[in-house]
């Protein structure tokens, strides 16, 4: 018996309200998976921006506050970044810290799909970390499988 491999891509829009903000994308990606053609496979989620990162964690408010505080302390905004220096860079956003934070977190995720739904642990959620907002953002969701 031959199994047909399907692939379906879609864009997901996201509007953020703060410079540093964590957004739970799980319900929106789950809806795309449930309405998509793939029953078993993988969902690839990719940020289309260098200052919007993706990660998996739980959505407990205090924990998300801790993550934001940790990122801000680990990679401070005012540090004399070369990317923020007009003599060295043509970037007018002065957002080097956001690029460095995103580099630490990553820009893509691979989540298993089984029986037409995402496979996540009890407390796991797909989270977007806005690191240079507020902005209008795009994510690409690619479903691959059968």
Label each PLM-derived region with a short phrase:
Residues 1-146:
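Active-site histidine-anchored catalytic micro-motif
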